[in-house]
Amino acid sequence: MRIWIDADACPKVAKELVCKFALKRKLEVWMVAGQPQVKPPFACVHLVVVESGMDAADDYLVEQAEPGDLAICSDVPLADRLIKKQVAALDPRGREFDARNMGDKLAMRNLMADLRDQGQMGGGQAPYGERDRQAFANALDRLLTRLQREADLRASQPHR
């Protein structure tokens, strides 16, 4: 299992938490970005800066992630593409994306984008705070534990 981060949109605090969890659990982290980033100084962390272009980082992430991996992203359409590929997805505020909630999340994202485009609503989320960091840490721990259990179960089953 690898952890993928949509690094352009992920708060630094959340990236640091992912690195801590990865070190503890001996997992690889792949940060994918369209802009240069500072790579944390750990051997388990890799940084890929893709060539600029619309959704180039998202496309790379979807192409490289494999079923059973985890992706950290706040981009709902990206999360939808990953979920369809059986890659778990979690946003930096601790909200898990899954097949059951993707329809609602996509509809809400599109509604909010329409309202912003019409000038009926201001842009963006609230600043990333301590409550977000704690919710993310808790959700990340739960999700990594579940994914590791699932991977161990698959590995213990005889191949047919």
Curated annotation (Swiss-Prot):
NCBIfam families in the cross-refs: PRK00124.1 (NF001095)
Protein name: UPF0178 protein PLES_56411
Domain of life: Bacteria
Family according to the record: Belongs to the UPF0178 family.
Record CDD domains: PIN_YqxD-like
